[in-house]
């Protein structure tokens, strides 16, 4: 039987269904505070499974204990009528997966800035002794200003806890480290590897490994050398290519030891300004951005003003100035 969409859960008034599978996500309103939130509810079929229920609540407890500007905030969690729910901040924008597919990630510098924010978020959870284990574009949200937020701690685990699922592959095939593929217990280094895959895809516009099924993907992860040619073709800075190569080293010990090193390398590239735009692959066209469609005289404005909000602000100032000119002009005419 299909789960009926609730009209209210606790103090949260449901406004719209946003999507989901094992969990349903809704846009809702906190009737006490008046703020808009995202409400994640475990579906009926999963709510009747004690293990699924326990994992959902574990995710909620873990995520609610983490506070960082680049990690989605969890405000509340609980259970109503046997269904666990989680209340998160409501985000405008889209997933990084959608942004990559629609070529809305911006220029090379903007893409590096997105990666840097993600790296800082992962570094923070590592300081909290948490391994995410599922770093991928679908689990990163990007707003219209390019602010990135890491989300979905569904299979995250405390770094010092050995889970019962060791011996099984846990994660998303394309982004799994070799040790995840082998079903070994993972450390922070697994997230470093997955970040390398994400950075590769973000800059090259394609995954480093392509295959038609999980078995072939796993074989390539374990045995095939990393193909760096797409990164060279995309004119990615050599220092960043080297960083990706190190992050995606098959032995965990050969990867950078922590995101302080990873983020430092990205920051250095941004400081040096050794950035090249990525040419569009043959036969593809990027969707024009809001800035691309501006008249040339507006494209010279500072970045904060090259947005709908910024232009609205300028329009308001212009209207006030025009009104003032007319008003004082009429006053002057009366005096004369």
Where are these regions (language model features)?
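C-terminal lobe helix-coil module of Hanks-type protein kinase domains
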Residues: 122, 141, 172-277
């Amino acid at each position: 039987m299909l789960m009926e969409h609730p009209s209210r859960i606790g103090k949260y008034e449901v406004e719209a269904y946003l999507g989901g599978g094992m969990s349903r996500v809704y846009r809702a309103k906190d009737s006490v505070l008046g703020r808009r939130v995202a409400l994640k509810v475990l579906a009926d079929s999963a709510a009747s499974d004690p293990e699924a229920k326990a994992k959902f609540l574990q995710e909620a407890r873990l995520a609610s204990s983490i506070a960082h500007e680049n990690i989605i905030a969890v405000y509340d969690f609980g259970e109503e009528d046997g269904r666990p729910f989680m209340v998160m901040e409501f985000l405008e924008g889209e997933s990084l997966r959608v942004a990559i597919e629609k070529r809305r990630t911006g220029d090379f510098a903007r893409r590096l800035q997105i990666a840097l924010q993600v790296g800082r978020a992962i570094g923070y959870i590592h300081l909290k002794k948490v391994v995410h284990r599922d770093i991928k574009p679908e689990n990163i949200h990007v707003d219209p200003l390019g602010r990135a937020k890491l989300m979905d701690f569904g299979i995250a685990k405390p770094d010092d806890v050995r889970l019962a699922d060791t011996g099984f592959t846990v994660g998303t095939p394309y982004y799994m480290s070799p040790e995840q593929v082998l079903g070994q217990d993972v450390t922070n280094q697994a997230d470093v590897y997955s970040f390398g895959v994400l950075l590769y895809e973000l800059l090259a516009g394609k995954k480093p490994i392509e295959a038609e099924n999980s078995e072939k993907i796993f074989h390539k992860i374990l045995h095939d050398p990393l193909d760096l040619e797409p990164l060279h073709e995309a004119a990615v800075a050599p220092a960043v290519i080297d960083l990706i190569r190190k992050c995606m080293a098959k032995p965990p010990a050969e990867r950078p030891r922590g995101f302080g090193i990873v983020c430092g390398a990205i920051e250095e590239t941004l400081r040096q300004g050794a950035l090249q735009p990525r040419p569009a692959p043959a036969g593809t066209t990027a969707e024009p951005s809001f800035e691309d469609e501006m008249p040339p005289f507006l494209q010279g404005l500072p970045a904060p003003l090259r947005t709908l909000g910024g232009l609205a602000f300028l329009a308001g100032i212009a209207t006030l100035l025009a009104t003032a000119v007319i008003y004082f002009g009429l006053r002057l005419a009366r005096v004369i």
